[in-house]
């Protein structure tokens, strides 16, 4: 994928999770990547990545740092976003097995199941073919990952587990300017998915 000549400013929600890895991947993919911990930092970015981590903890920290309502407002206004693992849960409209009191940002018309693939000891890797991504399947790392149980009519399914006991489970989706994966693309050296998102952000900026 061709990296855009301009450099979109992409934030990574830096409350918990694989922040450093996402920043490095976004930089390699052609973005001006910056950590976001405060509302004033959120206001300076063109798009946001919500990393893996623990979704209930990130929910609480976003509120504690005064980021929850600004996040909702920016997303409602059309800011592009990319959520990986816990980030997918935070972007989803509905969560099965949600923790008591857990809320989400609700911008993706999907139902996700928390920890669907099992516990930490059940972590695994798989090669996932992704719609729109050239170069063959993407090596995907699943760690206490969710999966998508239902999608709304405006949601495009980009990837499913191709084989094994979880074959057919939805693990990558897109709805407009919002992208989400159940796996951790930042934990491999393959930057294609981050480049795909950076290109999405650049295209949105041209509209």
Swiss-Prot record:
Q: Which residues form the active site?
A: 85 (nucleophile), 184 (charge relay system), 186 (charge relay system)
Pathway(s) = Cofactor biosynthesis; pyridoxal 5'-phosphate biosynthesis
Q: What is its EC number?
A: 4.3.3.6, 3.5.1.2
Keywords of this entry: Glutamine amidotransferase, Hydrolase, Lyase, Pyridoxal phosphate
Please give the InterPro entries that the UniProt record associates with this protein. Answer: Class_I_gatase-like, PdxT/SNO, PdxT/SNO_CS
Sites binding L-glutamine sit at 53-55, 114, 143-144
GO cellular component terms, alphabetically, are: cytosol; glutaminase complex
Top-level taxon: Bacteria
Q: Name one GO molecular function term.
A: glutaminase activity
Gene Ontology terms describing biological process: glutamine catabolic process; pyridoxal phosphate biosynthetic process; pyridoxine metabolic process
Q: Which Gene3D superfamilies match?
A: 3.40.50.880
**PANTHER family, A to Z:** PYRIDOXAL 5'-PHOSPHATE SYNTHASE SUBUNIT SNO, PYRIDOXAL 5'-PHOSPHATE SYNTHASE SUBUNIT SNO1-RELATED
- Please explain the role this protein plays, according to its UniProt record: Catalyzes the hydrolysis of glutamine to glutamate and ammonia as part of the biosynthesis of pyridoxal 5'-phosphate. The resulting ammonia molecule is channeled to the active site of PdxS.
Describe its partners and assembly state: In the presence of PdxS, forms a dodecamer of heterodimers. Only shows activity in the heterodimer.
Q: Please state what the protein is called.
A: Pyridoxal 5'-phosphate synthase subunit PdxT
Give the species this sequence originates from: Acidothermus cellulolyticus (strain ATCC 43068 / DSM 8971 / 11B)
From the broadest rank down, the organism's phylogenetic lineage runs:
Bacteria, Bacillati, Actinomycetota, Actinomycetes, Acidothermales
